[in-house]
Amino acid sequence: MGDPTKQALIAEDAVPPTGLLGFIGKFTIIFGARRELWLTFLLKFLIYTAYSVTNKTMVLWLSRDLGFSDQAAGAIVGWGWAPAMTVFTLLAGSLTDAIGLKRTFYLGVAICTVARSVMVTTTIPWLALSCGVLPLAIGEALGTPVLLAATRRYSTTAQRSMSFSLIYMVMNVGYLAAGYIFDFVRRSSGHFSLFGFEPTTHQQLFMVSLAIEIIIFPAIYFLRRGEEERAKSEARSASLVGGIAQTVGQTATETVQLFRRLIGQSAFARILVFFLLIGFLKAIFLQMDYVFPKFGDRVLGMGAPVGRLANINGWMIIVLAPLVGAMTQRLSAYRMVVIGGLICASGVFIMALPTTWFLTAAASGFGQWLGHSYLGLEGAIHPYYIMTAFYLIVFSVGEAFYSPRVYEYAAAIAPKGQEASYGALAYLPFLVGKLLIGTAGWVLAAFIPEQGPRRPELMWLIFALAASVAPIGLIVFRRYIRVPEAGRQDDQ
């Protein structure tokens, strides 16, 4: 799935298996893990489910509950909420080091709980944004590095590779759960009053996220109890407020030093352009949360099961990512990114084709199964359901090819001893994608307005052309931005 956390979870080198028993042992070794590691997996699932439900609801809530236009809602999400999360995530790593893992966990969840409560109870725009959306971005960002740190801390060296693989899988399961929750609440459309308060459908979705957030507190408590002996040995002396204040200055200094160190290197400019191009692919992934819900309501019908549709991507990535990785180990990361980018872009073009071309497919056995059995629809199946399924299937194949290899490429070309510095740039494609998706509100308003004639195929053509920028740019500028990868033989 398309989030920076998903790309940061790169497992360390695994211990080579020795025969069948060794291979099986790589999986069963996790059964002996500490209780805290399993609690970390639970926390990851809960945190990512709550985040994904909120993410899918955000643009609909901004427009229908707060009254923002498509353009304003897109700008708030693309140029405010999403980039703020990226920036705060970069700061959160140092904060975790300064105040400790437990405090960061509690701080992040507490901020999210207060922020979600505000978003549930108010429809005053300035209050919802300043006391809800912005603090939520801070709270959500605190969870990313602390979960990675917890996974590393609570796993042994032998368990570490499988631990990171499992937490990646748990993240995808959380994404899938959010899709089903999103559709269920929207379809239920239950209207109820709670002490005179009648929440909208979108506030009900935020209530689900809030309930999940509250459940996280006891999980952290038990994690804390199991960590007491280790915590005593760490002997952190920094107070919470002092740690935060110290972190702001420390992180700013480290960031300046990082870029000073990198700017003078020839590989830095190349990896920068490489990541900027990848940002166009990330924008297409992000539109599934920030554009697709409105497309579904306006083209497919109010309450369309867009969550289940989007889950096609999640299911396929869980299956395809390890298979593609195993079958393409000998290919260079750059070549894999180009191939994957071409496949992804071709998938988006499916959505720009005439819907009449898919009427037969909609009436076929596959179309009936997709619409009636998987999506739970009644009556005739709109061709866009079939087109979306085909688009997501093709896009998922491309994502399985390119997504894991993007960060492998950064590590492969990094000068020795600077792998972490180059890895810190891993958030750049998502940041670029989020900035690009901020313009989607104007595209949505132009081609799929809430009222008036609609031309969805033109919107998807624009998205397809945008996705094509990445593979075309990587091919055209290959001789300028490609750097030989350590251990690869197909760099010519």
Regions found by a protein language model. Give the residues of each.
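C-terminal ends and interior cores of transmembrane alpha-helices
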Residues: 110-124, 343-380
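Helix-loop boundary and gating motifs at the non-cytosolic
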Residues: 31-82, 270-277, 281-295, 299-302
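Intracellular juxtamembrane helix-capping segments at the cytosolic ends
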Residues: 142-156, 400-415
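Central cavity-lining transmembrane alpha-helices of secondary-active solute carriers
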Residues: 78-94, 311-324, 432
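Loop-to-transmembrane helix entry
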Residues: 68-82, 292-318, 382-390, 421-424, ...
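Glycine-rich segments within core transmembrane alpha-helices of 12-TM secondary carriers
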Residues: 161-190, 210-213, 425-440
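Hydrophobic core of transmembrane alpha-helices in multi-pass small-molecule transporters
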Residues: 45, 115, 126-143, 363-402
